[in-house]
Every structure is written in structure tokens, then in C-alpha cells.
Amino acid sequence: MNPSDYAESLTIQLRKGFLVYCVLLSCSKQEQYAGEIVRRLSDSELMVVEGTIYPLLNRLQKYGYLLHEWRESEQGPPRKYYSLTDSGFELVDELKHRIKMLNSSLKDLEKGVN
């Protein structure tokens, strides 16, 4: 595999790894329905595959990090709006901290510092 293709493959894996954090972070700012989350992540070039969002939202609800509320829509059927639970906000803070630590470690490694 050439370096460019391999780098693209690794980038896809990194995006998948960050997807939970990105979804939670997006919902931490305001309640959103799945289409808004997908659009926001797509605009940020963070979306891996649209079909991964719905199972992820269900999993985050199952684990108690998200809640949903059905709301009528002016355009089309009712929409399911997602918001974070207290545990969801705690998870966002924990992930933010760990990502900063990883970023710092990578910067140190690039500088040649242990």
C-alpha cells in the first residue's frame, strides 16, 4: 500500500475513534436531531459514514449519556432531539482531558522529548 492510501486508511480510523466525542460535543452545545448532527460533522469533515450515527446515538442512549425527546417538525415527520445527561457531560469533560493529554504527548514525541 502506498503512503497516501495508508495515511487515508489511518485517517478514517482516527475519525471513527473521535466520532463519539464529536457527537457528544455537538449535543453538549444544544439539543439536536440526527440530521443536524450529521450535517455538522460532515461540514467539519469528521463524518465517517452516515449510517454509523444512528447506531452510535442508540448506544449512547443505552449507556445513559444521551436522552431524546420527540418534537413536531414544521417540515415532515416528528424529529428525535438528543441532549446530554449529566453523565454525558462528564464523559465529554473526561474525553476532552484525555484528548488534550494525547495531543500533548504527540507534540512531545515530535520534539523528541519523553
Task: For the regions a language model picked out, list residue spans one by one.
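Short, Lys/Arg-enriched N-terminal segment that forms or immediately precedes the first helix
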Residues: M1-I12
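N-terminal helix-turn-helix DNA-binding core of bacterial DNA-binding proteins
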Residues: T11-T52, R71
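A generic structural signal for ordered secondary structure
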Residues: E31-A34, Q61, P78-R79
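Glycine-centered, phosphate/nucleic-acid-interacting loop/turn motifs that mediate DNA/RNA or nucleotide
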Residues: G64
